[in-house]
Amino acid sequence: MGKENYELYSVELGTGPGGDMAAKMSKKKAGGGGGKKKEKLENMKKEMEMNDHQLSVSELEQKYQTSATKGLKASLAAELLLRDGPNALRPPRGTPEYVKFARQLAGGLQCLMWVAAAICLIAFAIQASEGDLTTDDNLYLALALIAVVVVTGCFGYYQEFKSTNIIASFKNLVPQQATVIRDGDKFQINADQLVVGDLVEMKGGDRVPADIRILSAQGCKVDNSSLTGESEPQTRSPECTHESPLETRNIAFFSTMCLEGTAQGLVVSTGDRTIIGRIASLASGVENEKTPIAIEIEHFVDIIAGLAILFGATFFVVAMCIGYTFLRAMVFFMAIVVAYVPEGLLATVTVCLSLTAKRLASKNCVVKNLEAVETLGSTSVICSDKTGTLTQNRMTVSHLWFDNHIHTADTTEDQSGQTFDQSSETWRALCRVLTLCNRAAFKSGQDAVPVPKRIVIGDASETALLKFSELTLGNAMGYRDRFPKVCEIPFNSTNKFQLSIHTLEDPRDPRHLLVMKGAPERVLERCSSILIKGQELPLDEQWREAFQTAYLSLGGLGERVLGFCQLYLNEKDYPPGYTFDVEAMNFPSSGLCFAGLVSMIDPPRATVPDAVLKCRTAGIRVIMVTGDHPITAKAIAASVGIISEGSETVEDIAARLRMPVDQVNKKDARACVINGMQLKDMDPSELVEALRTHPEMVFARTSPQQKLVIVESCQRLGAIVAVTGDGVNDSPALKKADIGVAMGIAGSDAAKNAADMILLDDNFASIVTGVEQGRLIFDNLKKSIAYTLTKNIPELTPYLIYITVSVPLPLGCITILFIELCTDIFPSVSLAYEKAESDIMHLRPRNPRRDRLVNEPLAAYSYFQIGAIQSFAGFADYFTAMAQEGWFPLLCVGLRPQWEDHHLQDLQDSYGQEWTFGQRLYQQYTCYTVFFISIEMCQIADVLIRKTRRLSAFQQGFFRNRILVIAIVFQVCIGCFLCYCPGMPNIFNFMPIRFQWWLVPMPFGLLIFVYDEIRKLGVRCCPGSWWDQELYY
């Protein structure tokens, strides 16, 4: 097979001259070469320089060999499908499963253990070839080491496999079916079978199945919020209205939603060649950043591996110098490595992260990458999208102006009730107008669904008005039926109003009712009177001024404002059955009566303000990054607390002081709103300076490329950046961030694929839960690692004493593996369940460069203080066991050569008793067991002191963490099983030991506990002192 050539292009959707959206392509990476690569580049450029929106219908037909009435020929469609491939976004090339598994088996510590296993196997093979089979220790040790690496590797791979496949359930981006016309026949096919030149039809409620050039449309509006971040519906029509394909109205984009109306058009781009496909390419061109916890563990593994090799090599040289054979010295080197490397550490870390991920999953946070759990805890900046993340992603009626008063509507997510007076006749008239002058309709069969959650066919504004009407009137659709519609003029950009005429519900009243809604200033200019408390009053200058004040007040809140008016048509001029002609306009469209204003906004989620406040308390900066209008963005930012009360922008200060903006000192403004045009003109250093100067930032009208720039600028300031979002336009920034958080319900597939974490309930507040859990797991991992490292010293010192003082070996390699992977792993993991010592959400985020997972105080305290005490306990028990069997300590010194002599069968102890080699081996295994039990008894004290780093263990409580209590009991039970289970001496070299040998290490365990309580007392009493700096880890 030849090497596959591939090229990757990123797309920048930026703002061009005059505020136009422009597309810019940059080549990111190329593989292969020669003429094919150049040709492919030229083809890509041609696709980027799309001019399909400017071509006439006949030119389109010629270009794509299709018909605007009959569509493609079926035979040609099959050829094009073969040439271009399916109409689907190609997923990024994944890592093969065998490579993922191999990585789990070949990390830094794993490589050391493979080498150690190989040395053991070689030693056993040489022993076997020489006929020396007195012990199979080397074979058992090799098999144990291999089993450790394979089992931990399988566990790690399983966790990664679960994480990477969790996204498989989210496949909502590409529509399942599309209506296509081929050879003049209309039928439905899978959307991925569409090709360029296909003639397709779509209606309200459908997703756009490809990039489509509109040929005909009736009231068609699309929702581009997942692409641009704008909540407002966008009209689609056959006319070319802009040079840029991104701004013109006659192109509908792949994966956007058709809200209402119908449209027919030709497919001009499919799959990866669509606009959304190019943004996905931009995301795939962004390299994943290493997570802080991954960097920490990598750093720690490097240190441990380096020290293990250093100690092993040192002892290897010493062993060679005192007369060991090369093979025995290598086995000794391997023993040092096994003793020094915490084999269970990676499994412990993985289990701790998995437990936290599971805990988060129960709170609707799904973690795709386990390491992202801790990263969220160290987050110092959250760059949040607005639409759908901070807001509900649905337009909602927020304010009404009638009877010369602004009334506030209920914008909560359940919209349980309205707070304004509904008894006014003006209110009834306004409600009638907004209900009748509305083309939106509920999908059938939703009577049992709460009104705010019902699916509506219609654009966002009309959907908001319909739901508002349903909540206030009751049955809005039934209300419409009582006022049959006679004629209608749909909203268009020229008139900027919508008008409809209805017959009245009272059969005795023969009049018609004309109702109109639209841009407030356009509606007002068609009115001559205004409805105040049910009475029509002349629309004089006083009322026009009142209207203007209300209009500016609502517009200043960043809300979309519509005006409403009505007119009863005289039955003499317009009798029942009169034929209204919308073309000739044979009815009045001026002299109307103004009923009021209604403003709408995509309101913030109820839980967001509290979540933002918690972030601020936790020292986390929340920055809004949206594609929406700056005024709307600023209003939402202020309502959720991103811009705090009393904070002003430069523009606000200038307005307050009545001075030019350029004369205001920017450092006086706490808040800042930057739009895409301004951002484009800023160089990186200016952006960094703006982020440093203004604590409260809002970015509006941003492109995907600009979101990337913002994330990179925050990272340049040393921040750990989390990015939240749900749209396709968020995916590049989600991938670039230290942690990307996507929305599970409203989120696009591209966003979910790029993210590290998915919020199943789309609730920004869930991020705060994630931050708290992330901080807690870092604290608990620190405690777990401190506990794990402590026993390395009592495991290492027996070999140090063995080779320097020449005593019989106190501890065997297999025994060490049982400590690492059997008895100690359960208490180590149980620390993941430990509750926080204090309110960790009142602390600043940790600095990844300064607050390391394993720092000098932790290593020094674990190794040289607690570890040293455990070593003394082990040797006290070892020498006690030897003395009680007749081997006094002084006799043990220098005894090693005779002790290990296979041929010496009459070695005398301190009482003159003679010991055969088999008896000595039995005693040596007894010493292994004694030293093992000593370490385990001291580790019980160690795990109790690790419950807290600053508070007293009595303050934290001994029994609050029930898992830890169970783990300690389990640890003791395993120790008893290994000591007293029949057959253990022959398999794993564990021997039954006397009861008093269990008691020898207990005073040392008590010393560890008391010593640590004194340390914690000093840390609490002397904050900032030498004691605190050196002994608080």
From Swiss-Prot:
Gene3D superfamilies: Calcium-transporting ATPase, cytoplasmic domain N, Calcium-transporting ATPase, cytoplasmic transduction domain A, Calcium-transporting ATPase, transmembrane domain, HAD superfamily/HAD-like. The active site is at D385 (4-aspartylphosphate intermediate). Residues 25-38 have a biased composition (Basic residues). K(+) binds at V338, A339, V341, E343, E795, E820. Its EC number is 7.2.2.19. Residues 1-96, 162-297, 348-781, 833-852, 948-961, 1017-1033 are cytoplasmic. Belongs to the cation transport ATPase (P-type) (TC 3.A.3) family. Type IIC subfamily. It is a multi-pass membrane protein. InterPro entries: ATPase_P-typ_cation-transptr_C (IPR006068), ATPase_P-typ_cation-transptr_N (IPR004014), ATPase_P-typ_cyto_dom_N (IPR023299), ATPase_P-typ_H/K-transp_N (IPR015127), ATPase_P-typ_P_site (IPR018303), ATPase_P-typ_TM_dom_sf (IPR023298), ATPase_P-typ_transduc_dom_A_sf (IPR008250), Cation_transp_ATPase_P-type (IPR050510). Residues 14-39 are annotated as: Disordered. It comes from the Eukaryota. Residues 118-140, 318-329, 802-811, 876-927, 981-995 are lumenal. PANTHER family: POTASSIUM-TRANSPORTING ATPASE ALPHA CHAIN 1, SODIUM/POTASSIUM-TRANSPORTING ATPASE SUBUNIT ALPHA. It catalyses: K(+)(out) + ATP + H2O + H(+)(in) = K(+)(in) + ADP + phosphate + 2 H(+)(out). Keywords: ATP-binding, Cell membrane, Hydrogen ion transport, Ion transport, Magnesium, Membrane, Metal-binding, Nucleotide-binding, Phosphoprotein, Potassium, Potassium transport, Translocase, Transmembrane, Transmembrane helix, Transport. The chain crosses the membrane at residues 97-117, 141-161, 298-317, 330-347, 782-801, 812-832, 853-875, 928-947, 962-980, 996-1016. It is found in: Apical cell membrane. This is Potassium-transporting ATPase alpha chain 1. Mg(2+) binds at D385, T387, D726, D730. It comes from Rattus norvegicus. It is an enzyme of class 7 (translocase). The modification Phosphoserine is found at S26, S461, S599, S838, S952. The catalytic subunit of the gastric H(+)/K(+) ATPase pump which transports H(+) ions in exchange for K(+) ions across the apical membrane of parietal cells. Uses ATP as an energy source to pump H(+) ions to the gastric lumen while transporting K(+) ion from the lumen into the cell. Remarkably generates a million-fold proton gradient across the gastric parietal cell membrane, acidifying the gastric juice down to pH 1.
